[in-house]
Amino acid sequence: MGRVAVRTFGVEEELLIADPVDGMPLALASGILDVAGFSETDNSSDAGPSLKSEFKQEQIEVNSLPCRTAKELRAEIRAGRALADSAARAVGARVAALATPPVFHATPTAGNQRYAAMGTEFGLISREQLTCGFHVHVSIESPEEGVAVLDRMRHWLPVLLALSANSPFWMGADTGFASYRTQIWNRWPTAGPMDVFGSADGYRQVLSELLGTGVPLDEGMIYFDARLSRGHPTVEVRIADVCLYAEDALTIAILARALVETSASEWRKGEPPSGVMTPVIRMANWKASRFGVTNQLLHPLEQAPFAAADVAGALLRHIRRALTESGDLALARTGVANILRRGTGERLQRQAYGRRFRLSDVVSTAIASTHNYGERSDAGLLSR
């Protein structure tokens, strides 16, 4: 069980397709794929980011290539957003990194057979499922290592949710939540944190029993906060909102990679998983969803409320060695400090709404921020 040198990582960003004037979601994913040269069945690319259809025609997924360094991934994230937006402009729309649409009415699922079956089976849950997440894939050596990682990182994942929170509005109203996407997403029967699996066989047994109930239609509907990827030799960290700022997306990806490496290192050393109970992790997810970084979060080691900065600092200390080995320590500190200083996307959305109380302003501001890469930094807050 030798240590992997530097793990590759990549991301999937789900972006909202919106009218740039009134902010309404537009069902134009197929047109965007056509313009960009991708299809519903072939979204492969060897030369850069690619586009893919998603559950709703009002959203588009951007997939990065696997990357070795943060610099490479930053370029992929920016290029992916630009690619999607350029194609959206060609069909009269824009794309915005909004985890929920501020203005929305329930719509049918996208047109493929699988999504249609989900729409039939899950009714209003599927019709209202227009949310945009951010998934980080981190390479693993084996399913056994991957499950060991899942078992050891599960109680840290709510911190990533808090740092990404970007969905305060839903159906035209301020929900009071920083990440209301989490509340919408958790209506799916397999969503959320899981118990310790113990082994790759244990993981497969859980999947088999869940699929045997007939509730999830297929393995693609296993919506754990983190899971083994079906198509790649990776752990897929799925808990985060899509981040309004591209640099925040990079920060979440860096933290996720370091968390995977730290968890794998613990396994190699024979350290057991934390005994934190799954219902407590659900409480941590709820607080992260409710408050983002604006209030107290549950400390992963104490299972008690602490200031968000203290909890974020605990995560950085926990993964410091992995961040140092990958050369990402300073970048991670800067990224987390920026999020704590100016807030996540939920704060900018509420500020945009507060100026004129128009939800269209939220969308137009989000469009600009999605494609603005010139944000200043502040690394001092978490330098200790």
From Swiss-Prot:
EC number: 6.3.2.2
Pfam families cross-referenced by the UniProt entry: GCS2
Keyword terms of this UniProt record: ATP-binding, Ligase, Nucleotide-binding
Example GO biological process: modified amino acid biosynthetic process
Protein's UniProt keywords contain Flavoprotein: no
GO MF term list: ATP binding; glutamate-cysteine ligase activity
Principal EC category: ligase
Superkingdom per UniProt: Bacteria
TM stretches of this protein: none
Catalysed transformations (reactions): L-cysteine + L-glutamate + ATP = gamma-L-glutamyl-L-cysteine + ADP + phosphate + H(+)
NCBIfam families: gshA_cyan_rel (TIGR02050), PRK13517.1-1 (NF010041)
Job description of the protein: ATP-dependent carboxylate-amine ligase which exhibits weak glutamate--cysteine ligase activity.
Family: Belongs to the glutamate--cysteine ligase type 2 family. YbdK subfamily.
Protein's name according to its UniProt entry: Putative glutamate--cysteine ligase 2-1
Source organism of the structure: Paenarthrobacter aurescens (strain TC1)
